[in-house]
């Protein structure tokens, strides 16, 4: 795996509050290697460790993006929903930013069926067929389409399982993480001081509740994906 310079600035991470962990009583002892100190009953994350992990993750994403691989970004907690959609759209990644539907990956055949239903309903709407139906039936189909758009809109173009998943909150996305582990899909995950870093392939110690923190980490990761793809197209 190639190593590059990703302009990861410790002061910028401080300003984004990446270093702020949870209350000390909530900690997971496995996060001890990533904790710098505690202040007012709050654990402070070692940003040097964060920078090292983030750089490693960026190197990996750059390399596999250059090989045309596919990415899935997952973040359904309210702080992350808009950030995930924006970052994933800009980097042309698949994403889930609403409720994770159990079996979305492990029961991929069912997900494919739902995606096909979504595409069929979208086509019917776009061609004006809804307008030709009785109002009650059209309203029912519109509700179905809205639900599918809400939960599957971010993966509507996903035709196979992703090659790697980026997860913004380990505890909130435990089902998604579990499915990735079951299927052997590599994971990059923000891990706060109450998380278990052993559950992911590349843990990035960081505040997983703060909007600025999530945004900074996501921006660095998706920039690496974009750079890898740009190099591939040369």
UniProtKB/Swiss-Prot annotation:
UniProt KW keywords:
Chloroplast, Plastid, Ribonucleoprotein, Ribosomal protein
What the entry lists under Pfam families is as follows: Ribosomal_S2
One Gene Ontology cellular component annotation?
A: mitochondrial small ribosomal subunit
GO BP of this protein: translation
What GO molecular function annotation could you give as one example from this UniProt entry? structural constituent of ribosome
Which SUPFAM superfamilies does this UniProt record tie to the protein?
Ribosomal protein S2
Superkingdom to which the source organism belongs? Eukaryota
State its location(s).
Plastid, Chloroplast
UniProt-listed InterPro entries: Ribosomal_uS2 (IPR001865), Ribosomal_uS2_bac/mit/plastid (IPR005706), Ribosomal_uS2_CS (IPR018130), Ribosomal_uS2_flav_dom_sf (IPR023591)
| Protein family membership | Belongs to the universal ribosomal protein uS2 family.
Supply the PANTHER family for this chain. Answer: 30S RIBOSOMAL PROTEIN S2 PROKARYOTIC AND ORGANELLAR (PTHR12534), SMALL RIBOSOMAL SUBUNIT PROTEIN US2M (PTHR12534:SF0)
HAMAP family, alphabetized: Ribosomal_uS2_B (MF_00291_B)
Q: What is this protein called?
A: Small ribosomal subunit protein uS2c
Native organism is Pinus thunbergii (Japanese black pine)
């Amino acid at each position: 795996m190639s190593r590059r310079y990703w302009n990861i600035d410790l002061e910028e991470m401080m300003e984004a509050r990446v270093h702020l962990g949870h209350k000390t009583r909530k900690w997971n002892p496995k996060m001890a290697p990533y904790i710098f100190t505690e202040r007012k009953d709050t654990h402070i994350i070692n940003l040097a460790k964060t920078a090292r992990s983030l750089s490693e993750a960026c190197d990996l994403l750059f390399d596999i993006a250059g090989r045309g691989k596919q990415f899935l970004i997952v973040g359904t907690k309210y702080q992350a929903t808009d950030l995930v959609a924006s970052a994933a759209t800009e980097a042309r990644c698949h994403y889930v930013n609403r409720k994770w539907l159990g079996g979305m990956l492990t029961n991929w055949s069912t997900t494919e069926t739902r995606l096909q239903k979504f595409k069929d309903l979208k086509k019917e709407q776009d061609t004006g067929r809804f307008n030709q139906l009785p109002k009650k039936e059209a309203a029912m189909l519109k509700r179905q389409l809205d639900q599918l758009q809400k939960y599957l809109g971010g993966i509507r173009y996903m035709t196979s399982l992703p090659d790697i998943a980026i997860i913004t909150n380990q505890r909130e996305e435990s089902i998604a993480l579990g499915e990735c582990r079951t299927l052997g899909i590599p994971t990059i995950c923000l891990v706060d001081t109450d998380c278990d870093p052993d559950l992911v392939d590349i843990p990035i110690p960081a505040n997983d509740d703060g909007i600025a923190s999530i945004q900074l980490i996501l921006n660095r990761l998706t920039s690496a994906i974009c750079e890898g793809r740009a190099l591939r197209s040369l």
